[in-house]
Amino acid sequence: MAFKIKRGDKVKVLAGKDRGKISTVEFLDSKSGKAIVKNINIAKKHVKAIEGRREGGIYEIELPMPISKVMLVCPKCEKPTRVGFRIEEKDGVVRKYRYCKKCNENIDLVYEKNKVKR
Protein backbone atom coordinates (compact mmCIF):
# COMPACT_ATOMS: atom_id res chain seq x y z
CA MET A 1 0.00 0.00 0.00
CA ALA A 2 1.42 3.39 -0.99
CA PHE A 3 1.26 6.02 1.72
CA LYS A 4 0.77 9.68 1.05
CA ILE A 5 3.24 10.60 3.79
CA LYS A 6 6.94 9.70 4.04
CA ARG A 7 9.57 9.64 6.76
CA GLY A 8 10.75 13.19 7.43
CA ASP A 9 7.46 14.83 6.43
CA LYS A 10 5.98 17.54 8.63
CA VAL A 11 2.51 16.43 9.82
CA LYS A 12 -0.33 17.77 11.97
CA VAL A 13 -2.08 15.47 14.46
CA LEU A 14 -5.85 15.34 13.84
CA ALA A 15 -7.06 13.32 16.85
CA GLY A 16 -6.03 12.19 20.31
CA LYS A 17 -4.38 13.84 23.29
CA ASP A 18 -1.83 15.63 21.06
CA ARG A 19 -4.44 17.03 18.65
CA GLY A 20 -3.30 20.13 16.77
CA LYS A 21 0.44 19.62 17.32
CA ILE A 22 2.85 19.70 14.38
CA SER A 23 5.90 17.44 14.21
CA THR A 24 7.90 15.21 11.84
CA VAL A 25 7.43 11.54 10.94
CA GLU A 26 10.26 9.33 12.23
CA PHE A 27 9.08 5.86 11.16
CA LEU A 28 6.34 4.32 8.99
CA ASP A 29 5.08 0.74 9.34
CA SER A 30 3.39 -0.28 6.10
CA LYS A 31 2.13 -3.59 7.49
CA SER A 32 0.14 -2.11 10.38
CA GLY A 33 -0.52 1.31 8.77
CA LYS A 34 0.99 3.23 11.68
CA ALA A 35 3.54 6.00 12.05
CA ILE A 36 5.82 7.14 14.86
CA VAL A 37 5.82 10.94 15.06
CA LYS A 38 8.53 12.81 16.98
CA ASN A 39 7.45 13.87 20.52
CA ILE A 40 3.82 12.81 19.89
CA ASN A 41 1.82 10.01 21.59
CA ILE A 42 4.34 9.64 24.43
CA ALA A 43 3.90 6.91 27.05
CA LYS A 44 5.89 5.99 30.13
CA LYS A 45 7.44 2.54 30.27
CA HIS A 46 8.68 0.99 33.50
CA VAL A 47 11.86 -0.94 32.77
CA LYS A 48 13.52 -3.41 35.10
CA ALA A 49 17.30 -3.19 35.38
CA ILE A 50 19.43 -5.93 33.87
CA GLU A 51 22.76 -6.22 35.64
CA GLY A 52 25.64 -5.15 33.43
CA ARG A 53 23.43 -4.29 30.44
CA ARG A 54 20.86 -1.61 31.20
CA GLU A 55 19.75 0.70 33.94
CA GLY A 56 16.20 0.40 35.24
CA GLY A 57 13.73 3.23 35.61
CA ILE A 58 10.84 4.97 33.93
CA TYR A 59 11.43 5.80 30.27
CA GLU A 60 9.30 7.88 27.91
CA ILE A 61 8.72 6.23 24.53
CA GLU A 62 6.87 7.33 21.40
CA LEU A 63 4.04 4.95 20.51
CA PRO A 64 2.89 4.39 16.93
CA MET A 65 -0.34 6.05 15.84
CA PRO A 66 -2.60 5.32 12.84
CA ILE A 67 -1.66 7.18 9.67
CA SER A 68 -5.28 8.30 9.31
CA LYS A 69 -4.82 10.47 12.43
CA VAL A 70 -2.14 12.68 10.84
CA MET A 71 -2.26 15.07 7.89
CA LEU A 72 0.66 16.34 5.83
CA VAL A 73 1.62 20.01 6.20
CA CYS A 74 2.49 21.38 2.75
CA PRO A 75 6.06 22.74 2.66
CA LYS A 76 5.03 25.45 0.15
CA CYS A 77 1.82 26.90 1.68
CA GLU A 78 2.47 25.71 5.30
CA LYS A 79 -1.13 24.43 5.68
CA PRO A 80 -2.40 20.93 6.50
CA THR A 81 -3.53 19.43 3.22
CA ARG A 82 -4.68 16.32 1.45
CA VAL A 83 -2.14 14.80 -0.91
CA GLY A 84 -2.61 13.59 -4.46
CA PHE A 85 -0.40 11.92 -7.03
CA ARG A 86 0.33 13.40 -10.45
CA ILE A 87 2.01 11.59 -13.35
CA GLU A 88 3.82 13.72 -15.92
CA GLU A 89 5.47 12.56 -19.12
CA LYS A 90 8.17 14.66 -20.75
CA ASP A 91 10.86 13.69 -23.31
CA GLY A 92 10.18 9.97 -22.89
CA VAL A 93 10.59 10.11 -19.09
CA VAL A 94 7.65 9.37 -16.80
CA ARG A 95 7.69 11.12 -13.42
CA LYS A 96 5.30 10.64 -10.51
CA TYR A 97 4.90 13.51 -8.04
CA ARG A 98 3.08 14.04 -4.76
CA TYR A 99 1.19 17.34 -4.84
CA CYS A 100 -0.71 19.59 -2.43
CA LYS A 101 -4.44 19.70 -3.16
CA LYS A 102 -4.76 23.20 -1.66
CA CYS A 103 -2.08 25.13 -3.56
CA ASN A 104 -1.73 22.58 -6.42
CA GLU A 105 2.10 22.64 -6.16
CA ASN A 106 4.35 19.58 -6.43
CA ILE A 107 5.69 18.48 -3.04
CA ASP A 108 8.33 16.01 -4.21
CA LEU A 109 9.24 13.39 -6.80
CA VAL A 110 8.06 9.86 -6.00
CA TYR A 111 9.75 8.07 -8.90
CA GLU A 112 11.18 8.61 -12.35
CA LYS A 113 11.66 6.08 -15.15
CA ASN A 114 12.27 6.00 -18.88
CA LYS A 115 9.30 5.09 -21.01
CA VAL A 116 9.69 1.74 -22.77
CA LYS A 117 9.38 1.96 -26.56
CA ARG A 118 7.72 -1.02 -28.26
UniProtKB/Swiss-Prot annotation:
Family: Belongs to the universal ribosomal protein uL24 family.
Protein name per its UniProtKB record: Large ribosomal subunit protein uL24
Record-level Gene Ontology MF annotations: rRNA binding; structural constituent of ribosome
Assembly mode: Part of the 50S ribosomal subunit.
Record's keyword terms, sorted: Ribonucleoprotein, Ribosomal protein, RNA-binding, rRNA-binding
Record-linked InterPro entries: Rib_uL2_dom2, Ribosomal_uL24, Ribosomal_uL24_KOW, Translation_prot_SH3-like_sf
Disulfide bonds: none
Entry-linked Gene3D superfamilies: 2.30.30.30
GO biological process terms on file: translation
Classification via SUPFAM superfamilies: Translation proteins SH3-like domain
Source organism (scientific name): Hydrogenobaculum sp. (strain Y04AAS1)
Domain of life: Bacteria
Function according to Swiss-Prot or TrEMBL: One of two assembly initiator proteins, it binds directly to the 5'-end of the 23S rRNA, where it nucleates assembly of the 50S subunit.
GO CC term, one of those recorded: ribonucleoprotein complex
UniProt keyword Repressor present: no
PANTHER family in the cross-refs: MITOCHONDRIAL RIBOSOMAL PROTEIN L24
